[in-house]
């Protein structure tokens, strides 16, 4: 029997071959056959390190506290054993009850977990039912969903606590409880909700805590929910050449926009890119700026409806969009709480010290009152894009605004180089000497960029990673400066506010009024795009085209694709002007008169 070939035309190893080599396979983990079919349908070849370690322990009934890097397959590590135990229980007793509660910090992550459950249960969908409580539906609809006692409930701590208090969510038969992204849950302000859930939960529930870092927040949750858990600190060995290549550029505030223009217009980055900015207004300012050069992008922020945000991520993963501009408000607003002094042995000293430094800086930032009270729209507390969300095949993470902590930086760059792939992280840093030199493009968080960069370099060095300087040929870049200036002046504060209001109105209409229509007509959803033009105050069509004299000689062919224009099949001996002259001369000789039917027509009758 012929074996399938991978992208490098190398035969894919079979499970028998991997088992012979001592590698764990999904079949060797003892999972249900129907789940193995669902795994095969997802084209998973072999379990990752966290999956091979956590799944057997979960099947044994042990509590688990696992730390593994982003993109290492933590979701499947806790879902597969839970689904297996539900299927085995139903073979013995078909009684319907809620067996598993999965708590996540954001709506986007809840939707992702729900879709993962659906994919794994493709061959046992009738036996396992899951409900996502983070959808924007009325309380009556949520009660009706929970009335059937779904096997798995996915919710944020706030939704779970609310429904448990009203007895809509019954936890009496609960056997499994998972907190995904455990180090982020408390920073979203879910302390009281988690304590309430812990009081209502029956004793003896198996608990799994999944996190990318082990911090004091995780220790708090461990003391609240776990009973002598198995602590897994997993560091996967990266193959040579794989992982995230990290670069930094020190530049002025307006040069950020210049470099972004050059990067995308000259196609210096190939593939999909996520651009992180400091606040919502920066999202729209950057989008309006790029639009003037014909570069399309879509926006993710907490003011957009949740359905729109989820749809943007789905379409990005389907390669419909190449550029997402995402605001990371939680990090900028200093939502990382300062760790408590009592650190236990399980909390790593490096992470703990880094967290304390990051939290101090974040608190300094929040203490300073803003000079202007800006009228802001309603933000979604349960929004989060730099953590947990599985963006697929991201080539580059661009930190347009540097985060305020090394922890935030780690999770941002974790959106690329997932599941053994390679990726690039490029960060713009404002030196203190250049801070506030260009006020229209300045942002408050850039004041401490150099301090944060020093912490990032130190933190990455402890992991054996290097943050390298990225050198642009500024002589060639400066040739684009006047075009950047024209575009930047067109993006005024009024244009930003108008664009923000316009897009939020459009997205609300798409999200609420058309939701049912798209459920009934899924083909129409293809035409719903989120990267349409918002139009700045002054449209300058000439900026969309880069003249040849600005293009570098070496890279011109790569940008134009070697296009030399139209080439005719026949040689043209005369040009347009000479042809016109010849025609005019012919008219002068009388040929023009003969060709005029009014002068040559004769009405004589035939004899």
Swiss-Prot record:
Record Gene3D superfamilies: P-loop containing nucleotide triphosphate hydrolases
Principal subcellular localisation of the protein: nucleus
Compositional bias (Basic residues): 580-592
Superkingdom of source: Eukaryota
Keyword Nucleus among record annotations: yes
Basic and acidic residues: compositionally biased ranges: 353-368
Motif window: DEAD box: 180-183
Domain Helicase ATP-binding: start-end pairs: 55-232
Pfam families registered for this protein in UniProt: DEAD, Helicase_C
Ranges annotated as biased composition (Acidic residues): 334-352
Coiled coil: none
Enzyme Commission number(s) of this protein: 3.6.4.13
Motif, Q motif: chain positions: 24-52
Record-annotated Helicase C-terminal domain positions: 243-475
Keywords: ATP-binding, Helicase, Hydrolase, Nucleotide-binding, Nucleus, Ribosome biogenesis, RNA-binding, rRNA processing
A GO molecular-function descriptor: ATP hydrolysis activity
Residues annotated for ATP binding in this entry: 68-75
GO cellular component, one term: nucleolus
UniProt keyword annotation of Nucleus present: yes
Chain spans, region Disordered: 332-380, 580-607
Function per UniProt: ATP-binding RNA helicase involved in the biogenesis of 60S ribosomal subunits and is required for the normal formation of 25S and 5.8S rRNAs.
Family: Belongs to the DEAD box helicase family. DDX56/DBP9 subfamily.
Protein's name according to its UniProt entry: ATP-dependent RNA helicase dbp9
Species annotation: Sclerotinia sclerotiorum (strain ATCC 18683 / 1980 / Ss-1) (White mold)
Biological classification of the source: Eukaryota, Fungi, Dikarya, Ascomycota, Pezizomycotina
Gene: dbp9
């Amino acid at each position: 029997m012929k074996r399938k070939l991978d992208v490098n035309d190398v035969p894919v190893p079979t499970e028998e071959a991997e088992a012979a080599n001592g590698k764990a396979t999904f079949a060797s983990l003892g999972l249900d056959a129907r789940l193995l079919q669902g795994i095969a349908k997802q084209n998973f070849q072999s379990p990752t390190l966290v999956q091979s370690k956590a799944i057997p322990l979960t099947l044994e009934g042990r509590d688990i506290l696992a730390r593994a890097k982003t993109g290492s397959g933590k979701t499947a590590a806790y879902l597969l054993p839970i689904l297996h135990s539900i299927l085995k229980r139903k073979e013995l007793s078909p009684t319907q009850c809620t067996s598993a509660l999965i708590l996540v910090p954001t709506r986007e992550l809840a939707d992702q977990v729900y879709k993962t459950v659906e994919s794994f249960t493709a061959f046992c969908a009738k036996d396992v039912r899951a409900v996502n409580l983070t959808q924007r539906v009325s309380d009556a609809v949520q009660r009706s969903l929970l009335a059937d006692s779904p096997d798995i409930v996915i919710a944020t701590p706030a939704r779970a606590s609310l429904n448990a208090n009203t007895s809509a969510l019954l936890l009496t038969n609960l056997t499994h409880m998972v907190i995904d992204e455990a180090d982020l849950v408390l920073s979203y302000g879910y302390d009281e909700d988690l304590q309430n859930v812990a009081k209502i939960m029956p004793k003896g529930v198996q608990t799994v805590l999944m996190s990318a870092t082990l911090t004091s927040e995780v220790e708090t949750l461990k003391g609240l929910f776990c009973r002598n858990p198995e602590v897994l600190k997993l560091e996967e060995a990266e193959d040579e050449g794989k992982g995230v290549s990290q670069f930094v550029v020190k530049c002025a505030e307006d040069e950020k926009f210049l470099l972004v223009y050059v990067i995308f217009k000259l196609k210096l980055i190939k593939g999909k890119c996520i651009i992180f900015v400091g606040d919502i207004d920066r999202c729209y300012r950057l989008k309006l700026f790029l639009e003037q050069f014909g570069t399309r992008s879509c926006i993710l922020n907490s003011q957009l409806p949740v359905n729109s945000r989820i749809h943007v991520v789905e379409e990005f993963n389907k390669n419909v969009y190449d550029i997402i501009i995402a605001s990371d408000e939680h990090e900028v607003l200093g939502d990382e709480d300062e760790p408590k002094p009592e650190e236990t042995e399980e909390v790593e000293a490096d992470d703990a010290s880094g967290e304390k430094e990051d939290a101090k800086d974040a608190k300094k930032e929040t203490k300073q009152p803003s000079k202007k009270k800006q009228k802001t729209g309603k933000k979604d507390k349960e929004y989060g894009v730099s953590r947990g969300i599985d963006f697929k095949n991201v080539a580059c993470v661009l930190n347009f605004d540097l985060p305020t902590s090394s922890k935030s930086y780690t999770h941002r760059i974790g959106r690329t180089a997932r599941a053994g792939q390679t990726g690039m992280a490029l960060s713009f840093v404002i030196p203190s000497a250049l801070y506030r030199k260009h006020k229209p493009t300045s942002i408050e968080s850039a004041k401490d960029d150099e301090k944060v960069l020093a912490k990032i370099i130190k933190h990455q060095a402890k992991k054996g990673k290097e943050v390298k300087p990225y050198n642009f040929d500024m002589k060639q870049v400066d040739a684009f400066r006047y075009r950047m200036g024209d575009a930047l002046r067109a993006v005024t504060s009024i244009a930003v506010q108008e664009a923000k209001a316009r897009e939020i109105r459009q997205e609300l209409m798409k999200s609420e009024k058309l939701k049912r229509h798209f459920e009934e007509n899924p083909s129409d959803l293809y035409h719903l795009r989120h990267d349409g033009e918002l139009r700045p105050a002054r449209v300058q069509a000439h900026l969309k085209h880069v003249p040849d004299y600005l293009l570098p000689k070496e890279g011109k062919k790569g940008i134009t694709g070697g296009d030399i224009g139209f080439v005719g099949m026949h040689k043209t001996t005369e040009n347009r002007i000479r042809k016109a002259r010849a025609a005019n001369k012919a008219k002068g000789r009388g040929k023009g008169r003969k060709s005029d039917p009014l002068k040559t027509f004769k009405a004589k009758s035939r004899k």
